[in-house]
Amino acid sequence: MSFDLYVDTSRKGISIAVAAARSNAAGSTPDGCDEAFYKEIVDPEARGETLSKNLDCLLEQSGISLQDIKRIMVTLGPGSFSGLRTGVAFCQGICFSGMRKLYGVSTLEALECFAESQTADSAATTQTAVVVKARKDYWYLRLCGQESFDSTEDVLAKLSANQPKFAVVDATARDDVRLTEFFSTNGIKTILDEGNPLSLWAKLFEKHQPSLIQEANYIQPSYFEKGH
């Protein structure tokens, strides 16, 4: 029986989850695993140094051991330097033995998966924008497979040009007056990036290759900001 571990330290606090491994894009599980098995710990106030403790608690609650984990998916950002550095290094450490494979994915690409779960539309991710706060009046945007760091004006212009059907947003984007008005006026369904199981990211195992070497995306915003 094998399981997947999901680790997200790119947003507020720490989110960590374990789910029955899915062996293919269709979602079947190997070794007679319960496909519905899923446990998570979401601690918005947690800091990086508690990640090991959180994993121990999660494994205990799940009734499994680290040896049962065969694949690990960690978000690579964009996000905070300290959070990403801790999360990526932690996952590299527990994969170093070669007993499990490490997959790194863009946080925005991972969040994009939430649209498909909410709409029951397998094509949803191709019609989805992801908008999360970078800093005041600037956002991380994923649209049509491209990721960028944009002002509110640029985000609105890109959304207007591409007209997505869905938008995965964080609380700040949800509450932004200009973005909210645009979504409402253009009939774009918004999906909050909270409260969704991380196992919805399982489809990304099929898209990405495992590697012990992962580079977190915590420097990119600095390059963009130099131009503003």
Residue ranges and their predicted role:
Residues 71-102, 107:
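DPxDG-like acidic metal-binding loop motif
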Residues 55, 90-94, 111-115:
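Buried hydrophobic packing segments
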